[in-house]
Amino acid sequence: MMGMNPRQMKKLMKQLGIKMEELEGVEEVVLRMKGKEIILKEPAVTVMVVQGEKTYQIIPGSEEVREVLEISEDDIKLVMEQAGVDYDTAKKALEEAKGDLAEAILKLTEG
């Protein structure tokens, strides 16, 4: 397909039943995994439809990786019971303590 101009390429793709569309205005794409997130900023996103199946091609402008702290409901309930606080307060204390139960409880019961 060397030397094929864009118009010929579009015509060939249409004959093969392939549709392509560039998504405009995409600010970021977030990939969530256990324990971390990858944020793709200002990506070029193309959607290709072949035989009814969609495929997304993402080319990021920049990338950021963030660690994600996962706090279980059981941990939140334990802090609530031990420190005598509500759900939101217990969750916030655990987040600030990076999931450390003892540190969260001590912080809430001291002072």
Swiss-Prot record:
Keyword RNA-binding carried by entry: yes
GO MF: RNA binding
The encoding gene: nac
One Gene Ontology term from the biological process aspect of the record: protein transport
Annotated function: Contacts the emerging nascent chain on the ribosome.
Domain of life assignment: Archaea
Name of the molecule in the record: Nascent polypeptide-associated complex protein
Binding partners and assembly: Homodimer. Interacts with the ribosome. Binds ribosomal RNA.
One Pfam family of this chain: UBA_HYPK
Transmembrane segments: none
Keywords for the protein's UniProt record, in alphabetical order: Protein transport, RNA-binding, Transport
HAMAP family xref list: NAC_arch
Similarity comment: Belongs to the NAC-alpha family.
Gene3D superfamilies (alphabetical): DNA helicase RuvA subunit, C-terminal domain, Nascent polypeptide-associated complex domain
Residue ranges annotated for the NAC-A/B domain, each copy included: 3-72
